Amino acid sequence: WNGPDELELEISSTDGVGHIRARNQLHKGFSWGPYKGNFTGSSSSPGPADLNISPSWDVDGDCWLKYVTLVSCEAEANAVLYRKGDLIWCKTSQIVEQDEVIQAFLKAEPQAIPNYTIKEEPGETSQCTSTLPEFQLLPQQAGMAAILATAVVNKDVFPCKDCGIWYRSERNLQAHLMYYCASRQSSTSPSMEEKAKDSYPNERICPFPQCKKSCPSTSSLEIHMRSHSGERPFVCLICLSAFTTKANCERHLKVHTDTLNGVCHGCGFISTTRDILYSHLVTNHMICQPGSKVDVYPVVKAVPAVKSSNPVVSQIASSSLLKCGLCGFLAEDFQVFNHALLHTTNPVPSATHSVKSPPENINEKQNPESQENGNAKSPISSSSSASSRSEETPLKLYIKQEPEGQLSISEAGSTTCEAKDGVALVQSPAIKVKTEMSSPTPGSSPVPNETGAATGGGTVIIPHYVFGHEATAAIVPQASEILAKMSELVHSRLKQGQAVTPAGFSGSAVPKGATCFECEITFNNINNYYVHKRLYCSGRHVSDENSSSARKVKALPARTALASGFSSTEQEASPPQEDAGEESSAPVVAVKLEENSGMDCEGAGSGHVSEGSQSPSSLDDPEEDPNRTVCGACNIRFSRHETYVVHKRYYCASRHDPPLRRREVNKPGPPYTTQPTPRTRKRRKLYEIHGVAPTESTPPSPHTLGRVEAMALMPGLIPAPVMPSPSSSPDAVDGPIDLSKKPRLVAEAPVPSAAATVAPLADYHECTACRISFNSLESYLAHKKFSCPTAPLQQKTIQQLQKVKSPSSATGKLVDDTVKVKVESKAALSPGSVSDTIQPLALPFSTISDPKQLQQYSSVTEASLSATTTCPYCPHNVIIRGDLLEHFRSVHGLILAKPTAGHRLQTTIMEVLVPARGQTSSASENSLPSPPVSSASPLQLPGLRRENSNYKDTTSSSSSVNGSPILTSTPRPLLPTSPAPPSNSLPLAESRREDGLPRVPSQVLLPGDKAMQPPKPSLISPVPNGNHRYCRLCNIKFSSLSTFIAHKKYYCSSHAAEHVK
């Protein structure tokens, strides 16, 4: 005998005719071949008339196919002989029992027979290679295939026929078949192979001859026997679903709960914890009745005397009480009916239509497909036959049906039977009903249906070395380590997408574990997949309309994407004015622009923000969008929206970048181009900050002064352009911050109204020496250039001081060493009276040397000054209403000395005494009367020292060796030199005399706040002899050179220009 090992040749002794019999049971689709040969006659299949003649086979003389018995009817045959070209194949068309004769039917090519695994004959390898699809083996597979023929069969490895998994222990195989096998829910799965000789003492074998399943314990055998008997003792009282095990019923009960809100759908019970909710479900909505079958539940006994409208209620004989058929609750009349509503929600016919439970084995033999994992598809499937015998209307149970597209692989169809009066059973179309949750197996994991994929399990077969279901036969064990390794390599190649399954495979590739296609993550463990889908999947918040469609990745708007270094294609632009036809070749994901994120103008406050607030990009991309997980600025994709929100709020690179200017919707013009990239922070040296050449400043014209509403009381006399506030002009903060030292020319904008408040981010630019914050960079640079005491005097200012001091010191007409800055209301003084009192004075940092210019300027200022004024210590866009002195006292803590007798003080007039920086002679000082000073007076302050080393040539007589000035008998008060940005004002300087007598200073503005005290750099002169361990700006002397270098590198106030949060 040279045929397959599964077959044997039997030659009759009487007539000498040979027959082919099966040694073992063969499955449907078992194949042998190919064999070189052809049928007798034409290329088409021979007809029935040709079968009367003994066919001749064009095959080898010793081929076993010529002994196969041929039949004329396909229904009588258990095998099929067909050909493909010049090759002949033999395949079983149904299950062939042991010792059964092979009867074949001739066919040209089978169309309805599934393409199962074929077995390759050892002598026909070359022929098989030329016909089967080519599959290039990996080097490891080729080496293993070479030694496969001589490999020793490992009999201690136990394979699973349906899953293609080999186990080293039979106990592991049994556990796999009971809990994890993909085909464990199918009642038509092939029978297991015979048990090994050595059996374990605690194992139990199923007594059914067609099953012979081995169970590790008695309890597991009892549970397994329920699949044969149809017993379902665990019942869900909400939907009346029955289950074989308690775990399956408890898992089903979770469907009737809202775990997010903790609400039970059955009775409305609300719980704060999930454990209490599950305990409530098991206690109140699940019962266990041993011996319950798959009848329509609950069982109702017919009581002729009582016709109840509720099937779960029955009447007890010789009593007026009614009993609930579910829980045994006893009550009278309608109390039981109201109680029964807790168990059933769908209407069921009356109790007169009784149901008698038929034998369950008959039902199961007729409809074996109605069982899955021992659980009935619907209770009506088993009781329909009993209803038909009693010739009564069957009970109709409304079953919740799922859409066909959303059913899982494990959900199979079940048939429902309906009977009419006197009519036999008519089988209705199969419907798919909702059953218990399938087991977490790779075969039932939610994977997308691909083209050519089969729903059942199967093994991945290499065409050159085909190993089918016969590999698990008892006499041909194919469970070596070589085959296991080759199968593992094939699985890994298919998983990585490096190969495509040929058409000759016996089944589709079953992926290992499960894949989340929304997050593009593959899990080896199915439990990890379930945890991911429940807690971490990005599709948890996606709405229903988005879940069915393809996943659309949303990114940042195009302008942010361009700023980040990549471009994107605007596929769905909401504004019709946008050019949607532009295409980009950059390899990025398509961007879907939301309708509410159009190209509208940015509102106020869209500039830089502080640490705790939202970033600029979060204003454009609201965090409320639960679908956004891509950060375009950092080019990072997050799996969860919560992680994306935390990243955008605390870690995103766009938090400190200014938002790019948004293009107007209705603004015509060329396409939008990105702004230049802001310069990074650079460590600047001292000469870079203060080494700016002074610009020529001219007095403002009366036309320019006519637009000024308030004048700042500061000594700097340079007119700065009016800076728009962030609230009035969003374009001012739209572009990148320019940290250059040159003030930009900005178009004039109307001064904000009196109701304007302090703009946000007022501490963005801060002068560390003066402790003053500025809203704009121009105001900060103007302060550092002209008003900051740490800035050195410019050459032009020194020359002007010398010119002004020389005539004053020669004539001795300098009456007072202070400058009176006077601010009056419009009706207080006329321009003429003011012009008579103007005298040339020595003003610090003054650029006006002509008294006529000052006279002209002061007259225009007083004429245009209103009741509202500005504070030198507040931001430039804040206008003070009312008394400025009261504002100084309440807001800034500045104290005013009481006026002397005979001084007239009006509510609209304020005089501020500013000490002249260039004192000429001590004789003029001694000739002036001084106010009385007590020992505790705050006028005796060390703030009377010289402010700058540039005065060393003019104050050499009043300075000591260490740089401290010699205090005179009358200390002079000092005004805090911390001006506000000189944006729209010029100081008004005036010297006033009354009755030809020198005026005694009556009002002195004292520094009451620490922030308003004179800066430290003006206290000590630099150390002589060129000592480089002394910081002139910070007025700190260091003992070591290393400490001095560290101070200049990290802590010096010269880095004030870089003070950007």
Curated annotation (Swiss-Prot):
Residues at which Zn(2+) 1 binds: C160, C163, H176, C181
Q: Name one GO cellular component term.
A: nucleus
Which SUPFAM superfamilies does the entry mention?
beta-beta-alpha zinc fingers (SSF57667)
Q: Where are the zinc fingers (C2H2-type)?
A: 204-228, 234-256, 262-285, 869-892
Q: Which organism is it from?
A: Xenopus laevis (African clawed frog)
Which controlled-vocabulary keywords does the entry list? Activator, DNA-binding, Metal-binding, Nucleus, Repeat, Repressor, Transcription, Transcription regulation, Zinc, Zinc-finger
GO BP field: anatomical structure morphogenesis; erythrocyte differentiation; heart development; megakaryocyte differentiation; negative regulation of transcription by RNA polymerase II; positive regulation of transcription by RNA polymerase II
- Which molecular-function annotations from GO does this UniProt entry contain? DNA binding; RNA polymerase II-specific DNA-binding transcription factor binding; zinc ion binding
- Top-rank taxon of the source lineage equals Eukaryota
What this protein is reported to do is described as: Transcription regulator that plays an central role in red blood cell differentiation. Essential cofactor that acts via the formation of a heterodimer with transcription factors of the GATA family GATA1 and GATA2. Such heterodimer can both activate or repress transcriptional activity, depending on the cell and promoter context. Acts as a repressor of red blood cells, probably by modulating activity of GATA1.
The residue ranges flagged as biased composition, category Polar residues, are 436-448, 565-574
Amino acid composition bias (Pro residues), ranges on this chain = 973-984
User: What's the domain remark here?
Assistant: Some of the CCHC FOG-type zinc fingers probably directly bind to GATA-type zinc fingers. The Tyr residue adjacent to the last Cys of the CCHC FOG-type zinc finger is probably essential for the interaction with GATA-type zinc fingers.
For this protein, the record's PANTHER family field holds: FRIEND OF GATA2-RELATED, ZINC FINGER PROTEIN ZFPM1
Q: What is this protein called?
A: Zinc finger protein ZFPM1
Give the residues the record marks as binding Zn(2+) 4. Answer: C767, C770, H783, C788
Q: Which segments show compositional bias classed as Low complexity?
A: 378-388, 933-942, 954-972
Query: Where in this protein does the record put region Interaction with CTBP?
Result: 736-742
> Which segments does the record annotate as CCHC FOG-type zinc fingers?
152-185, 508-541, 623-656, 759-792, 1023-1056
Native organism taxonomy: Eukaryota, Metazoa, Chordata, Craniata, Vertebrata
User: In which family does this protein belong, per the annotation?
Assistant: Belongs to the FOG (Friend of GATA) family.
Give the record's subunit note: Interacts with corepressor CTBP. Interacts with the N-terminal zinc-finger of GATA1 and probably GATA2.
| Residue sites binding Zn(2+) 3 per the record | C631, C634, H647, C652
Show the InterPro entries listed in the entry. FOG, ZF_CCHC_FOG, ZFPM1/2_PR, Znf_C2H2_sf, Znf_C2H2_type
